[in-house]
Curated annotation (Swiss-Prot):
GO cellular component: cytosol; small ribosomal subunit
Annotated NCBIfam families: S20
Name of the protein in its database record: Small ribosomal subunit protein bS20
InterPro entries xrefs: Ribosomal_bS20, Ribosomal_bS20_sf
Taxonomic path: Bacteria, Pseudomonadati, Pseudomonadota, Gammaproteobacteria, Candidatus Pseudothioglobaceae
Keyword Cell membrane tagged: no
Function: Binds directly to 16S ribosomal RNA.
UniProt GO molecular function: small ribosomal subunit rRNA binding; structural constituent of ribosome
Biased segments, Basic residues type: 7-25
Family: Belongs to the bacterial ribosomal protein bS20 family.
Amino acid sequence: MANSASSRKRARQAVKRNKHNSQIRAKVRTFIKKVTYALEAGNKEQAQNCFTIMQKMLDQAVNKGLIHKNQAARKKSRLNSQIKAL
């Protein structure tokens, strides 16, 4: 348990940031799933639309330090190659 006022404030801020960051990560995962489901259904247009949104969200997550830049690049590259293969 936090004792000083500053440590209590830090604990509150950590909870708030954790909630916000987990929401952003969940949105990114949701759009990755949307692209994957569109690929499985063979719907190239929907996959392409979701992919552009997903790219933007991944880049924002990288800039905020939630996802490593190499991980984001890997996800974008693999999904883009699957879209091109359709």
